[in-house]
Amino acid sequence: MTKLSAQVKGSLNITTPGLQIWRIEAMQMVPVPSSTFGSFFDGDCYIILAIHKTASSLSYDIHYWIGQDSSLDEQGAAAIYTTQMDDFLKGRAVQHREVQGNESEAFRGYFKQGLVIRKGGVASGMKHVETNSYDVQRLLHVKGKRNVVAGEVEMSWKSFNRGDVFLLDLGKLIIQWNGPESTRMERLRGMTLAKEIRDQERGGRTYVGVVDGENELASPKLMEVMNHVLGKRRELKAAVPDTVVEPALKAALKLYHVSDSEGNLVVREVATRPLTQDLLSHEDCYILDQGGLKIYVWKGKKANEQEKKGAMSHALNFIKAKQYPPSTQVEVQNDGAESAVFQQLFQKWTASNRTSGLGKTHTVGSVAKVEQVKFDATSMHVKPQVAAQQKMVDDGSGEVQVWRIENLELVPVDSKWLGHFYGGDCYLLLYTYLIGEKQHYLLYVWQGSQASQDEITASAYQAVILDQKYNGEPVQIRVPMGKEPPHLMSIFKGRMVVYQGGTSRTNNLETGPSTRLFQVQGTGANNTKAFEVPARANFLNSNDVFVLKTQSCCYLWCGKGCSGDEREMAKMVADTISRTEKQVVVEGQEPANFWMALGGKAPYANTKRLQEENLVITPRLFECSNKTGRFLATEIPDFNQDDLEEDDVFLLDVWDQVFFWIGKHANEEEKKAAATTAQEYLKTHPSGRDPETPIIVVKQGHEPPTFTGWFLAWDPFKWSNTKSYEDLKAELGNSRDWSQITAEVTSPKVDVFNANSNLSSGPLPIFPLEQLVNKPVEELPEGVDPSRKEEHLSIEDFTQAFGMTPAAFSALPRWKQQNLKKEKGLF
């Protein structure tokens, strides 16, 4: 049986973040040189160990990659080694099965410069060489806008289409041909890959030229080379659209219980979306089917060893039983070491042995209360990661302007009503703060739960108008009633009051109720608000402070579980609600009038609020698109600032709020649809997200620290120093720079013979195709070299027989030439 060798164990580095790659050779794991990372042969299988540094520990992902022409034995060995490596890591890794052509975004993301799939494999003598070599002739089809994959295709114009980028690699010259319908970003990615091949594989001693498909006449020398190597230019195929995955499929979750009964796989459906963590028992194994797009296997810590060891084979049998494609992605999750992607398929995911955030979290029902650490406003811009965690750009002491929507227009709110938010209204709040000498803006759009649809629409429209007035600089934050973020509360210094309904308009004819009850939550000036609840006894809670306002009195009711800080903040906000003297009432010592005002005694929540297991929140970045008329979100694993492209829009999900980042060159439709797109994301999220989650719209160049803090080493000057595609193209030079090299490539001697040909003096005689095909040596015409039959053909016959020009044939690897000659009867 295949075993992880002592040599592999000895060389295995499990403490340093980064990649390690092995190829399966003669059923053994053989290390791949780091200089060739990102280059894979389609006849082989590989194992990739990715180590990531998290806040307090390391996480591990093991991928095994299956080339389309690899043998079943190699595939089996790769799977076994993956399991053994996970055992060596004591079950701390997530295992991934990757099949050529259907690699996960996480896998592609490891190779930022591009993933190159080459023909051949170890069985045909193909090696991962470190030395510079110019003996290369191939055509690479580059697919993808972000994490690109480049595969070798037939060296012929018929391989081309109008929508993609192609690299014609001729050793000393690489020609990048851009389809006329390819995007700027696809061209930039293609150029990055071409330069990577030049610098890493050829030591920088290769020319790179670019041909734009819509203007081929501008590159006559390069087109001469292409036509020489690829044959006569032909009509191009139409652009091939990228595979589109419907959001509904991603959201279609089914959880199955797995058991291995007497060697037979038995699966039983347990639940469908939305899923909760308590469905997973530590004693069992489960399969989670994400609409057939991806299969997850979860192994409970106390499950029997046979079931745990057979996790991957269970998944493959499940795929077969469901008649899913063999290339379906598989992830094996260990109990306690689950990936962020897996965790966020559940409504909430907690880990009892982890600490998260900046304070202890307590909960009753679905309401959480955070014991805040001391707030330090000076740290927000120096340490944006603190700003991101606390969701604070400063301490709320900046300048504020507030408007209310009236008759669909903006009307300034009288100063005496600042901090009062009525559920029947919508408000716009513009907050101005300084970083150094520069002004920055936050634009809050607060929408009451009882406001009319016209007012809600008008609030969004007026936000756009106000945003334009300030040159698009404000960060827009949509705040549904009840979802007020800490910074908004901090502006009112502990005096924010939210009313169930009503309005503060001067012409309001409705009178508010004579008795009102407010639940106060918060421990300091930066996190306190009073929220109106129905004035009934059953809405009390022993863990909080409540303000009960009647016509004759104002009570401050203190539950047994509230803290001293909460009582002090409640006194402050109570002064905003009522000017009358407050009567402090301790739970259990209420006067009769108190209960009478609430309509009589009634049971209410009086159990001690328990400490919640720490909620695990991993920020996730998605590239968004609605160009097809459907919302698409592509996740970017291990993201950093470089992943934010100026042409696109992105969504940063930090669970209790969602940022929508707009690049300055994004198309207008995507800019206008920012809020709608973010809401669509929440609606189609597999875990069943709260549609009222706050949405924050951020424009490139005006990012607040609450956003930048989620990125490692954010550079505010990045885009001012970044070179455009046009700049990079200009740096490559023009056709005069490589005239000598193009002359070498187009010289007649390479028309028929390749570099390995055993050339005789003078040209070989030409014979008709039918006199050479499937003929034994004794039946060949006189003068024919039996080992070089193809060189006795005319160019027309050669092209007819092989489906390509002699030059294209000569560019193929030696093993493929031999296979083609056998196939065509010319061996």
From Swiss-Prot:
Protein name: Villin-1
Domain of life of the native organism: Eukaryota
GO BP of this protein: actin filament capping; actin filament depolymerization; actin filament polymerization; actin filament severing; actin polymerization or depolymerization; apoptotic process; barbed-end actin filament capping; cellular response to epidermal growth factor stimulus
Pfam families (alphabetical): Gelsolin, VHP
Keyword set includes Cytoplasm: yes
Modification note: Tyrosine phosphorylation is induced by epidermal growth factor (EGF) and stimulates cell migration. Phosphorylated on tyrosine residues by SRC. The unphosphorylated form increases the initial rate of actin-nucleating activity, whereas the tyrosine-phosphorylated form inhibits actin-nucleating activity, enhances actin-bundling activity and enhances actin-severing activity by reducing high Ca(2+) requirements. The tyrosine-phosphorylated form does not regulate actin-capping activity.
GO MF annotation: an example: phosphatidylinositol-4,5-bisphosphate binding
Gene3D superfamilies referenced in this protein's UniProt entry, alphabetically: Severin, Villin headpiece domain
Region annotation (Headpiece) ranges: 735-827
Domain HP intervals: 761-827
Effect after changing Y46F: Reduces activities regarding actin capping and actin severing. Does not reduce lamellipodium or ruffle localization and cell migration
LPA/PIP2-binding site 3: annotated span: 816-824
Chain's gene name: VIL1
Effect upon mutating E74L: Inhibits activities regarding actin capping and actin severing
Location of region: Necessary for homodimerization: 2-126
Effect of D86L: Inhibits actin-severing activity. Does not inhibit actin-capping activity
Described function: Epithelial cell-specific Ca(2+)-regulated actin-modifying protein that modulates the reorganization of microvillar actin filaments. Plays a role in the actin nucleation, actin filament bundle assembly, actin filament capping and severing. Binds phosphatidylinositol 4,5-bisphosphate (PIP2) and lysophosphatidic acid (LPA); binds LPA with higher affinity than PIP2. Binding to LPA increases its phosphorylation by SRC and inhibits all actin-modifying activities. Binding to PIP2 inhibits actin-capping and -severing activities but enhances actin-bundling activity.
Effect of Y461F: Complete loss of phosphorylation and interaction with PLCG1, does not reduce lamellipodium or ruffle localization, inhibits cell migration. Inhibits interaction with PLCG1 and lamellipodia localization
Sites bearing Phosphoserine, chain numbering: S366, S735
Stretches the record annotates as LPA/PIP2-binding site 1: 112-119
InterPro entries tied to this protein: ADF-H/Gelsolin-like_dom_sf, Gelsolin-like_dom, Gelsolin-like_dom_sf, Villin/Gelsolin, Villin_headpiece, Villin_headpiece_dom_sf
Effect of D61N: Inhibits actin-severing activity. Does not inhibit actin-nucleation and actin-capping activities
Keyword Cytoplasm carried by entry: yes
Annotated disorder: Biliary atresia is a chronic and progressive cholestatic liver disease of chilhood characterized by an abnormal villin gene expression and severe malformation of canalicular microvillus structure.
Region (Core): 2-734
SUPFAM superfamilies: Actin depolymerizing proteins (SSF55753), C-terminal, gelsolin-like domain of Sec23/24 (SSF82754), VHP, Villin headpiece domain (SSF47050)
Tissues with expression: Specifically expressed in epithelial cells. Major component of microvilli of intestinal epithelial cells and kidney proximal tubule cells. Expressed in canalicular microvilli of hepatocytes (at protein level).
